[in-house]
């Protein structure tokens, strides 16, 4: 089995607008998505090498130093599949995709030569 890094993305601007939504409406929508996400995870639990976690604020390190940055990554996971296509197909219909302009990226993980 091959390993794949999965990143769940949503534009920062979309999330900022979502936070302005009526609190009762937002709570109901978030509870619905949590329930759908939990069901999806239970249905696909066999593909996860690491269910991952949410990610926070971003720092960028360059030759010039360290600075704050923003990106659209909300969460990450590690999954196992026979092929890249099979890994990607596993995420079709994922509840995360209900977020406007969201996406899920799946990248094959390769061992670094000579590294443990």
PLM features per residue range, with description:
Residues 1-116:
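Conserved, structured core segments of small domains
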């Amino acid at each position: 089995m091959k390993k794949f890094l999965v990143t769940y993305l949503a534009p920062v601007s979309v999330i900022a607008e979502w936070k302005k939504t009526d609190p009762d409406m937002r709570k109901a929508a978030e509870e619905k998505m949590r329930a759908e996400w939990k069901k999806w995870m239970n249905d696909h639990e066999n593909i996860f090498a690491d269910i991952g976690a949410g990610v926070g604020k971003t720092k960028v390190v360059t030759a010039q130093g360290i600075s704050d940055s923003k990106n659209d990554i909300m969460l990450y996971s590690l999954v196992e599949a026979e092929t890249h296509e099979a890994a990607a197909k596993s995420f079709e219909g994922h509840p995360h995709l209900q977020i406007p302009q969201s996406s899920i990226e799946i990248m094959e993980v390769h061992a670094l030569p000579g590294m443990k």
